[in-house]
């Protein structure tokens, strides 16, 4: 892929930020599209915070909110990532990206389709590779995490959040002073 190829990432939450960071580390141009009020579980490591704060930095990668697609070039020139509020992805047809990555993690498709770019990728469940997008990346923790699926879907959403750290501590005897 050419270094000047445009990659649009829909979503700037914590998992999307990891994807964005990796793409930028490879020297690729990334534009992030977000909603008007993005929600992220781990906000301190989510570039979507730029929507609220005007800019956000995660692991040395700076994101800057822009108000129009035309402002993206000046942000890239600063070595930063532009973040545009465009929940429907209205700018995608005009921007003509080489790749669109759906990292919204809504557990369902909110409008990403294969005709948006020559290569379309979705993170997590709710998409069918070969139908909705070209590839799906497994996001469920475990031995399949990160697997690229070219036909079919990621593991369906169970509705039960994954455990991070300790979930429950059972004390069988009362503690004594």
At which residue positions do the language-model features occur?
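Buried, small/hydrophobic-residue-enriched core segments of structured protein domains
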Residues: 2-151
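Anionic-ligand binding region
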Residues: 146-167
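Residue-level detector of conserved catalytic or cofactor/ligand-binding positions
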Residues: 169-177
């Amino acid at each position: 892929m050419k270094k000047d190829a445009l990659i649009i990432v829909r979503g700037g939450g914590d998992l999307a930020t990891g994807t964005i960071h990796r793409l930028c580390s490879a020297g690729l141009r990334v534009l992030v599209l977000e909603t008007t009020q993005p929600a992220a579980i781990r906000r301190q490591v989510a570039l979507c915070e730029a929507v609220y704060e005007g800019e956000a930095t995660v692991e040395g990668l700076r994101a800057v909110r822009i108000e129009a697609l035309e402002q993206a070039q000046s942000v890239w020139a600063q070595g930063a990532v532009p973040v545009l509020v465009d929940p429907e992805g209205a700018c995608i047809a005009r921007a003509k990206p080489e790749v669109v990555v759906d990292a919204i993690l809504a557990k369902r498709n909110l409008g990403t389709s294969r005709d948006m770019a020559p290569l379309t990728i979705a993170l997590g469940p709710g998409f069918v590779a070969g139908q909705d997008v070209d590839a799906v990346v497994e996001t469920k923790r475990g031995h399949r995490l990160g697997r690229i699926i070219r036909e079919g879907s990621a593991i369906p959403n169970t509705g039960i959040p994954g455990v991070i750290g300790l979930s429950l501590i059972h004390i069988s005897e009362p503690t004594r002073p």
